[in-house]
A protein has these predicted regions:
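Basic, alpha-helical terminal appendages of large translation-related enzymes
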Residues: 2-3, 10-19, 61, 183, ...
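Flexible, glycine-rich loop/tail regions that form catalytic "lids" or insertion modules at the edges
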Residues: 75-79, 149-197, 202, 207, ...
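Short, compositionally biased low-complexity segments
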Residues: 23-29, 108-111, 178, 198-210
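Glycine- and acidic
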Residues: 115-123, 187-193, 211-216
Length: 462
């Protein structure tokens, strides 16, 4: 990088400018008027080289002078009006420490690094289109001087992939972190790689989105549901299934002992049930769980007075406990405040899934459940979109005003025993709910924590 700068000076393609930053800005001109040559533009290469080495050796103050490329101050492309390529800045570098007090500018370092790393196609977004003439000019000069070899990298521009309900500005994302609107850069609601990974997004799902979105010179917006759809598609064939009750209420089966029997101690026997780990991959085997006289069900699966089209539990209605028996609801218990505290039912004999005659009784509703005897308590974090507006910062508006107050809801759930072996980053489909991942930071076998990656359906499309 430094050798290239010295070459540009000796070849007459660069000079040291001692104007202030404000003078350089004013004299660069704008789209309506050409720039004005610096009074230092026509120094000899020898004098410029001496000055540049003084900059390198710490002989001048920060901001007192810069190295600029000598191109064309009347160019209609402002990027070609003698851009700054080196400046004085006394700041430690994470690799070289205090060895250097001059540093190259990004626009100068970028094409050189591409060439040194043998990049053939430098891909960037449309805002860099006006930078391409400078990119090509610099590489051509360095090839002429023998510092780089032909052919040079080629820069190609395409439109940015904009997702609705997402911001990608680093400054605005930093504001979310530092204002404690999120828990950190790896918060599962953040569009950072660490955030997406913690949310449960897979590399395959992100690649699939990029492939489907394609590249274009025209800017546009991709709906966030497209990303969610790609994740569902990639997880559908690989995610093991499990049952989980996110808002548990106890279901008490009053005739359990009479139908299933009791053990030697007079306690109701447990009935072992099983289900495939994955419905389309029998080679993965089956998972085991027990049903007893008490099981956990979703509070929303019971209505004392059902609405039209409600086919789950209400007094007098029959449903199937998935992978288990058919039951008939007989009523409920309530607390002093009138809230339902338990649901009551009776077991219909000879209806266990997979047994002869189990389908003799037809039901319209099938609900998931977890046994009281072997269910595991777990923290479940229900994540949603971070913003309520498709374009939170459109038109320069305050993006914080459209933060979604319901973007995170934490519930205490009960999950089936097969999840006792879940490890951080393991992904599952919780039947009827969606795809979940064991949190890579907080999950332990002793204290399970699962994050909602994506629901089974797009709820925002309603």
């Amino acid at each position: 990088m430094y050798r290239a700068a010295e070459y540009l000076i000796t070849a007459g393609h660069a000079y040291v400018d001692e104007q202030s930053a404000e003078e350089i800005r004013i004299n660069r001109g704008d789209f309506s008027r050409p720039g004005v040559d610096s009074p230092f533009r026509n120094r000899s290469p020898e004098e410029n080289l001496t000055r540049f080495r003084e900059m390198r050796d710490g002989g001048h103050l920060d901001g007192s002078m810069v190295l600029r490329a000598r191109i064309d101050m009347a160019s209609p492309n402002i990027n070609m009006r003698d851009p700054t390529i080196y400046r004085i800045r006394r700041a430690p570098h994470h690799n070289t420490g205090d060895k250097w007090c001059i540093y190259p500018m990004y626009a100068y370092a970028h094409p050189i690094e591409d060439a040194l790393e043998q990049i053939t196609h430098s891909i960037c977004t449309l805002e860099f289109e006006d930078q391409r003439p400078w990119y090509d000019w610099l590489l051509a000069r360095l090839i002429e001087g023998g510092l780089l070899t032909a052919p040079p990298p080629r820069q190609y521009e395409f439109a940015r992939l904009n997702l609705t309900y997402v911001i990608t500005s680093k400054r605005k994302l930093a504001a979310l972190v530092y204002d404690h609107k999120v828990s950190g850069w790896d918060d599962p609601r953040m569009p950072t790689l660490v955030g997406l990974r913690r949310r449960g997004y897979t590399p395959e799902s992100i690649r699939l989105l990029a492939e489907r979105a394609g590249t274009s010179k025209a800017g546009g917006w991709t709906d966030y549901s497209s990303l969610e759809g790609c994740l569902r598609e990639t997880l559908e064939e690989v995610a093991p299934r499990a049952m989980a009750v996110l808002d548990p209420i106890k279901l008490v089966i009053s005739n359990w002992d009479a139908v299933i029997g009791v053990d030697a101690d007079g306690n109701g026997r447990l009935d072992e049930c099983s289900a495939p780990v994955h419905p389309h991959r029998p080679e993965l085997g089956r998972r085991q769980f027990a049903m007893g006289s008490e099981v956990w069900i979703e509070r929303g699966d019971f209505m004392e007075t059902p609405s039209k089209g409600f086919f789950r539990l209400y007094p007098g209605n029959k449903v199937r406990l998935k992978y288990g028996h058919v039951i008939e609801c007989t009523g409920c218990s309530k607390g002093p405040d009138g809230a339902v505290t338990a649901v009551h039912a009776t077991l219909i004999p000879d209806t266990k899934s997979g047994t002869p005659g189990s389908d003799n009784i037809k039901v319209k509703g099938v609900i998931t459940w977890v046994g009281v005897s072997d269910g595991l308590p777990a923290e479940v974090r229900l994540y949603d979109r971070l913003f309520t507006e498709p374009q939170p910062d459109a038109g320069g508006r305050d993006f914080l005003a459209s933060l979604n107050p319901d973007s995170l809801r934490v519930v205490q759930a009960i999950v089936e025993p097969s999840l006792a072996q879940a490890q951080p980053d393991d992904r599952f489909q919780f039947e009827r709910h969606g795809y979940f991942v064991a949190d890579r930071v907080d999950h332990t076998p002793a204290k399970p924590v699962f994050n909602l990656s994506v629901g089974l359906k797009d709820t925002w499309a309603r």
